[in-house]
Every structure is written in C-alpha cells, then in structure tokens.
C-alpha cells in the first residue's frame, strides 16, 4: 500500500495542484459567508504562483539536493558495476509511439554509454519497471534495451531488474540481482536531485555505491538570481524539488532510510 499511497499523495501535494485546490476552496468560501477569508486565500495562491514563475524558487529548492552528492571527478579508479535507476522513460508516450520517449531525466540513459566506454569490464544494471498506477503500462526496460543496443552496448553486459516501482524497491531488487561482492566498486547513476534519497536506500539495503549524479537542473548556487525562462521549467523545478523533500520525509518516517538528509561518508 505504501506505493499506492505515495503516488496519490505525491500527486495531490504537487505545488501546482495544491494551488489549484486552494483556489477552488477559496472560490467556494463566499457561499459560506467568509468572503474576506476567501479573498485572502486567493491572494496567497496567486502570490505563490507568481513567485514560482518570476523568481528562481525551484533553483533555491534544488540546490541543497543537487549539491549534496557532488560528481566524483574523472578518476574513479576500478569500476566493477554501474546501477542505473529508471524514471527517464515517458511510458505513456513511448507506449503510444512504439519507441523510446524520454522526460527530463534522459541523462540517466545517456551517461552509462560513456561510462562503459571508459570501464568496459563493468557490469551494468538497469532497475525499474513502471512507477505508474495505471494498469497495462509497458515496462521501461523494454524501451531501454532497444536504445542501449542501438547505442552499441552488448545485451549480455546488462542485467534488467523489472519489478521495482519506487526507489526503495530499486535498491532492494537490484542488490538481489547484481549480488555485489565485498570490495567491489559500484556507481549509482540517477538525477542529481534524486541522489540523496537514492544513496540512502542503497545504504539501507547494504549495497555500497559511489554517487554519479546526472541531469542537473539548478545553477549550483543559492546566490544565483534570475527570472525563469519558461513557466513549464519554473514550475517543473519546484515540483521536482518538493517531490524529493517529501520523499525523503516519507522514507525517513517509515524507516526506509536512516538519515533524513543523507550526506557523503
């Protein structure tokens, strides 16, 4: 039930949806004789929306997440394996078109291609089935297989874990599939904002990994002030950040991670 609850509440608590719900509630209050309170709520919702559109709110929220685990640098030493978390495939578009369609996390699928050129002996694990509540959605791995094969990755070099539906299951199921040995060096590839929660659940699963963050969306600095270039990007960054903060809180409260805001060791 955790998976279902997390998806439903995650959808309802997305910033834009909260504002819409607040605006709808405010529109109904005048009929209960509370016009002043209704007007204030509408003003607050509009002010928050304008702040997210005209100020780098998303950047301010993303920077602490994306800078928590910095890129490891060019000298990674020996690399025995690479775990790539799913979430880059737009399953609805891919299923409808019949070929790979990606979202803003596409770099998760691109980075391993270059990594395997540098570390051809490394094993590659892709973990992720579908994070959708809708039945009949085609699994991410079906599209990733074809994409990586066309990119020149040997099919025999990749293990596909296709049962996991969330980050916690990514860690547990990929460890069972990869069976990492003591002393092996594994990289974890996922979006930079997603890395704190991801590393934490892999630690909980006793699968030691080195963070290899990709797909940065922030400037990396809290002092960088700018006007977002698009409403979609501005609201998307806020939603991505809030999704991770809520995910960290939910995982910590349910014992899926040991630290509320994990840090490098």
Where are these predicted regions, by residue range?
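A structural signal for short, hydrophobic/glycine-enriched beta-strand patches
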Residues: 46, 51, 55-239
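Membrane-embedded alpha-helical segments of integral membrane proteins
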Residues: 1-30
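Membrane-interface helix-boundary motifs at transmembrane edges
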Residues: 30-40
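Hydrophobic alpha-helical segments of integral membrane proteins
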Residues: 1-9, 57, 61-65, 242-249
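Extracytoplasmic/luminal low-complexity segments enriched in Pro/Gly and acidic/polar residues
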Residues: 223-229, 236-265
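Transmembrane helix-loop junctions in multipass membrane proteins, especially transporters and channels
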Residues: 35, 64-71, 255-259
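Hydrophobic alpha-helical transmembrane segments of multipass integral membrane proteins
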Residues: 18-24, 43-53, 245
């Amino acid at each position: 039930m955790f998976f279902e609850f997390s998806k439903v509440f995650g959808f309802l608590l997305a910033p834009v949806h909260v504002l819409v719900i607040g605006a709808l509630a405010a529109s109904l209050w005048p009929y209960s004789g509370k016009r002043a309170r209704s007007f204030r709520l509408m003003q607050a919702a509009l002010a928050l929306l304008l702040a997210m559109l005209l100020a780098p709110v998303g950047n301010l929220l993303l920077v602490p997440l994306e800078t928590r685990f910095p890129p490891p640098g060019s000298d990674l030493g020996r690399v025995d394996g690479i775990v790539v978390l799913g979430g880059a495939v737009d399953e609805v578009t891919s299923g409808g078109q019949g070929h790979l369609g990606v979202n803003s996390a596409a770099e998760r699928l691109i980075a391993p291609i270059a990594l395997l050129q540098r570390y051809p002996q490394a094993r590659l694990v892709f973990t992720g089935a579908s994070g959708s509540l809708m039945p009949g959605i085609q699994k991410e791995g079906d599209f990733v297989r074809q994409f990586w094969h066309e990119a020149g990755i040997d099919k025999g070099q990749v293990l596909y874990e296709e049962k996991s539906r969330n980050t916690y299951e990514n860690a547990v199921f990929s460890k069972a599939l990869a069976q990492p040995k003591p002393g092996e060096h594994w990289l974890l590839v996922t979006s930079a904002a997603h890395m704190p929660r991801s590393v934490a659940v892999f630690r909980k699963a006793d699968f030691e990994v080195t963070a290899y963050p990709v797909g940065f969306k922030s400037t990396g600095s809290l002092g960088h002030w700018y006007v977002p270039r698009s409403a979609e990007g501005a609201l998307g960054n806020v939603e991505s950040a809030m999704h991770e903060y809520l995910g960290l809180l939910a995982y910590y409260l349910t014992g899926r991670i040991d630290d509320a805001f994990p840090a490098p060791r």
